[in-house]
Amino acid sequence: MLTIGVLGLQGAVREHIHAIEACGAAGLVVKRPEQLNEVDGLILPGGESTTMRRLIDTYQFMEPLREFAAQGKPMFGTCAGLIILAKEIAGSDNPHLGLLNVVVERNSFGRQVDSFEADLTIKGLDEPFTGVFIRAPHILEAGENVEVLSEHNGRIVAAKQGQFLGCSFHPELTEDHRVTQLFVEMVEEYKQKALV
């Protein structure tokens, strides 16, 4: 059985675990770097990106996360997790993991009061998906080899590059688990290749 981890430092961790399990995989809350060895893929959940970065540093996750990526294991960043995954952050010369070849802008849809839901057309899904946006970032620029999966009002809100998936919204806050399912399928594909 596939095991997918959720970085459990902050954010909607339980909801992600519920979504993973609803897709037929096992979910594990990752609170220590050595637990990364137990999972086939990892979700970096929403929350607050600067707080998350501080916790990543405090619990010495930065290098283990980079090693995890270097092994080819899939990673999915949602909301603040997208910022952690991104190669570049607008207005900052200090990216976090720098893995997904995109430029992101923080809080680009406004402050908390500007939380909203929107029906999104997402590549790979037949029907629209309701995206829940909370102080969401968006992707200003998608670099080479990045596939844009969804846009909202001309702004990129989901993208994929190889083993990395990122989105501006919170897919775990709805009972529609199709976006999580896309990630589960990426992890399945990785695991099958790893077994060959």
From Swiss-Prot:
Which Gene Ontology BP terms does the record give?
A: glutamine catabolic process; pyridoxal phosphate biosynthetic process; pyridoxine metabolic process
Mutation: residue 48 to A; reported impact is:
No activity, disturbing interaction with PdxS
What GO annotations for molecular function exist for this entry? glutaminase activity; identical protein binding; pyridoxal 5'-phosphate synthase (glutamine hydrolysing) activity
Q: Tell me what reaction this enzyme catalyses.
A: aldehydo-D-ribose 5-phosphate + D-glyceraldehyde 3-phosphate + L-glutamine = pyridoxal 5'-phosphate + L-glutamate + phosphate + 3 H2O + H(+); L-glutamine + H2O = L-glutamate + NH4(+)
Q: Which InterPro entries match?
A: Class_I_gatase-like (IPR029062), PdxT/SNO (IPR002161), PdxT/SNO_CS (IPR021196)
GO cellular component term, pick one = cytosol
EC number of the protein: 4.3.3.6, 3.5.1.2
**What Pfam families would the database entry show?**
SNO (PF01174)
Which UniProt keyword terms apply here? Glutamine amidotransferase, Hydrolase, Lyase, Pyridoxal phosphate
Q: Which residues bind L-glutamine?
A: 47-49, 106, 134-135
Query: Pathway, according to UniProt?
Result: Cofactor biosynthesis; pyridoxal 5'-phosphate biosynthesis
> What does the sequence similarity comment in the record state about its family?
Belongs to the glutaminase PdxT/SNO family.
* Role: Catalyzes the hydrolysis of glutamine to glutamate and ammonia as part of the biosynthesis of pyridoxal 5'-phosphate. The resulting ammonia molecule is channeled to the active site of PdxS.
Q: Which HAMAP family does the record associate with it?
A: PdxT
Q: Subunit structure, per the record?
A: In the presence of PdxS, forms a dodecamer of heterodimers. Only shows activity in the heterodimer.
Query: What name does UniProt use for this protein?
Result: Pyridoxal 5'-phosphate synthase subunit PdxT
Q: Please name the source species.
A: Bacillus subtilis (strain 168)
